[in-house]
Amino acid sequence: MSKGINSRKVAVIGTGFVGSSSAFALMESGLFTEMVLIDADKNRAEGEALDISHGLPFARPMKIAAGDYDDIVDAAIIVVTAGAGQKPRETRLDLVKKNVAIFKSIIPEIAKRNCEGILLIVANPVDILTQVAVKLSGFPENRVFGSGTTLDSARLKYLLGEHLQVDARSVHAWIIGEHGDSEIVAWSSANVSGVPISEFCEMRGYTKHDEHMEEIAQGVKNSAYKIIEKKKATYYGVAMAVRRICEAIIRDEKSVLPVSSIQHDTYGIEGVTLSMPAIVGKDGIEKQVKIKLNEKEQEALKKSAGALKKVLADLDI
């Protein structure tokens, strides 16, 4: 992290449901002493800053304020949540053109100020927008990445924990590829405290392993659609994912997280942004981790990359 960076300062661009929930989660985390909220609707940003600030007597001292792009120059992390929200029955990829247009107004503002912090993309479709952000900012790839399938992987762990009646924190499993309809469960590497998932299922008395696993995979994939159908938007889960990623950066944890970044020679995939586990620390992505995948998973990953590549080819960036 650069000397010109305040390692205890974070900026959140976009104060809709996801941005404000992320800001609240970051306030509670104790990771930062300063937070700037930016939104095209300045009144909304000011209102969120005030509302969250009123909870500070129950947390830790910090400065929270609405601001503009000049206020983010020394931020250690710039979280970008701004964008149109996903509507019922709308896929994340349906949001592409609307949110690319929004990013064309946001990312150049960050770039022209020579910000040296980490750019964490959260807006959807996160894989496409992360690649757009890399191109528009000109920043090194390690400093620009997306929340990716961090939330999807948490959903997978939660559902597996419920199914197997075990603490979700003991479940180690990844969702990889697109944060969207072509995402893949890396079942071949999934385990519960070192015990392969299929063996653990048998140990818990579940014999219809394939059937249950397919049901859980679909449950993860449909989670967002189900929530949006019921309450119009998802925001608490992703806010916790944002907090977790920021924690790994600020504490230089070198944690392995399934974030979205441009892939290089990942099972033959080159130059496409999607989620794979990566080591995350104070300088962003330190190294991509190539986990073992079986042939079926490798083919599904290539198919996911192909779908994203097709969308990218149609964009004017």
Each PLM stretch: what is its role?
Residues 57-118:
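Rossmann-like NAD(P)-binding element
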Residues 15-16:
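Glycine-rich Rossmann-fold phosphate-binding loop(s) that bind the pyrophosphate
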Residues 34, 38-76, 90, 309-317:
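Conserved N-terminal Rossmann-fold NAD(P) cofactor-binding segment
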